[in-house]
Regions:
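An N-terminal boundary/leader segment
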Residues: 1-46
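Amphipathic alpha-helical segments that form the core helices of the histone-fold
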Residues: 34-35, 53-57
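Long amphipathic alpha-helix in the N-terminal Rossmann-like dinucleotide-binding domain
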Residues: 50-54, 108-112
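Glycine-rich loop at the start of a catalytic domain that most often binds anionic cofactors/ligands
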Residues: 56-61, 85
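General beta-strand structural signal in soluble alpha/beta enzymes
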Residues: 74, 114-117
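Enzymes and membrane/adaptor proteins characterized by extended Gly/Ser/Thr/Asp/Glu-rich
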Residues: 66-106, 110
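Short secondary-structure junction/hinge motifs that connect adjacent elements
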Residues: 26-29, 44-53, 67-74
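Flexible N-terminal pre-Rossmann segment of NAD(P)-dependent oxidoreductases
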Residues: 3-7, 62-70
Length: 118
């Protein structure tokens, strides 16, 4: 099988639906790839690996195929609850919103898994 991080969301969801891939494996593969390339790319300002993997595990244990489990990241100008939002400046370095932006809330309600900020 292809490395899970290389799969399209459509292909990964099909494999999850056929019990050939877990959400945990998919998210874990994404983090492995990020760790492998981040020194070169320098794209991520915040990663939430522990919470993301825990969420993936919860979705896998539920067995609910309607919860997609798609890993997603957002720009550091968009709020995600209990996650630093720095707007790319030191002035806001201690800004930790308590609520998700509407787009993040909708993604999470659909079972998508927040992995971090770029």
């Amino acid at each position: 099988m292809t490395n899970p991080f290389e799969l399209t969301a459509t292909d990964a969801i099909k494999l999850i639906g056929n019990n050939k891939l877990s959400r945990y494996e998919w998210v874990q593969s994404c983090f492995e790839r990020i760790r492998e390339k981040e020194d070169l790319v320098k794209a991520w300002v915040y990663l939430d690996e522990d919470r993301a993997l825990e969420k993936a595990k919860q979705l896998d244990n539920k067995g609910d195929k309607s919860q997609l489990g798609i890993p997603f990241g957002i720009k550091d100008i968009i709020d995600a609850s209990n996650t630093p939002t720095g707007f790319g400046t030191n002035f806001y370095q201690n800004n930790v919103p308590m609520r998700d932006a509407a787009s993040v809330a909708v993604a999470k309600q659909s079972g998508c898994i927040f992995i971090g900020k770029t």
